[in-house]
Amino acid sequence: MGEEREATRTEYKLEMDSELRFEIENKNEKVTVTLMNGHAELFGTELVMRKPYEFGVGAKVAIFTYHGCTIELRGKPDVAYVARETPMVQYLNSNSALEHLRAKAEQDDTQGPVVMIVGPMDVGKTTLCRIFLNYAVRLGRRPIYVDLDVGQGGIAIPGTIGALLVERPAPVAEGFSQQAPLVYHFGHTSPSDNDVFYGVLISKLAETTLERLEANKKAKYSGMIINTCGWVKGGGYRHILHAIKAFEVNAVFVLDQERLYNELLRDVERAVQIVFLPKSGGVVERTKSQRAEARDNRVREYFYGSKMPLYPHSFDVKFSDVKIFKVGSPALPDSCLPLGMKREDNYTKLVAVQPGPQLLHHILAVSFAESTDDNVIQSNVAGFICVTNVSMEKEVLTILSPQPRPLPQTILLVSDFQFMDSH
């Protein structure tokens, strides 16, 4: 132990309106950040002086200072540099405009701004949402965060959309507190896998969150910040237009793509403000395998936690104790459809799934619906389980669950997403 060398220390002096960016790709590397003097923030969350913050593999970090500061890095990031060109001041100005609208809403007892962030993949949409949310709660607001990105599933897990009342800034190295989120099961990681069902869920989530805004004065004045996925052409663009109407959006921030900005100016009602913002130079493009790894990590965190470990439960569930469904059945030619049924109905149909080996490693959503007489596809979910073993002989599924037995409800919805539990 005595021969173990102390981690490399590097000190960075940042000038006003600059940021320190670093990335960690090495699985065995940990980098610790400490603010030595001055003021700095990470995506809108303030760093506490002399408190060490630890980051691991996959971290892509940008620590910004408005007034100048000194930061110490311990460890060896793959990339680390200071950038003086950053859009943070523009992001802050945009936030000031939103805060002005919130103050006016409070004064007039009307609804605060409902804001949507759009743009192609890898332009920093989730980061900008986080910045806006953190700034809002630092000013005493309580905005609702809505995530329509089924690819990464920032509020629950991939294959879902959801909403969350944000009451405190996100911890520096983690996401927002996940207490009592409203989550809907989609079951795929791309909206194009079931276009019709995705549209139905957007409408349902919009209806529910707008009701919640009305019921909570503080949230009503604070408004919403809506994150979207990076599919911005064709069907993806139609979903953006649908979401703008469904959520009664009054401001859209377009990151990086002028074509999308101009299309929205052309197609959206004039009452909706369309604002173009540049992406940060620190945004990193992710490969397909990096996206898949990020999805896996998200599910692993759901069951096992991140900084604070969680201890999930493993137990058996009898086939006869649960009802398993998937949403959507293969499309039939029009001539084969039952009388009065439309082709679209196939995509939102509840299809019974027989328990069997095909469910191994699949994520199942536990629906709040109590029976199939309820509108199951539009019911929110209590949480998720993973099938770790199937015994046809005993007719039981072995599942990984965040809670001990029994399951809170018996209707389970199959996700395309698979998670290989390596614990």
Curated annotation (Swiss-Prot):
Keywords linked to the UniProt accession: ATP-binding, mRNA processing, Nucleotide-binding, Nucleus
Q: Which PANTHER family match?
A: CLEAVAGE/POLYADENYLATION FACTOR IA SUBUNIT CLP1P, POLYRIBONUCLEOTIDE 5'-HYDROXYL-KINASE CLP1
ATP-binding in keyword set: yes
Known role: Required for endonucleolytic cleavage during polyadenylation-dependent pre-mRNA 3'-end formation.
- SUPFAM superfamilies from the xrefs? P-loop containing nucleoside triphosphate hydrolases
List cystine links: none
Organism, as annotated: Culex quinquefasciatus
* InterPro entries for this protein: Clp1, Clp1/Grc3, Clp1_C, Clp1_C_sf, Clp1_N, Clp1_N_sf, CLP1_P, P-loop_NTPase
Which family is this protein grouped under?
A: Belongs to the Clp1 family. Clp1 subfamily.
What positions does the entry give for ATP binding?
19, 60, 122-127
The name on file for this protein is: Protein CLP1 homolog
User: Per its record, what are the GO molecular function terms?
Assistant: ATP binding; polynucleotide 5'-hydroxyl-kinase activity
Q: What is its main location?
A: nucleus
Task: Look up keyword Nucleus and say if it applies.
Answer: yes
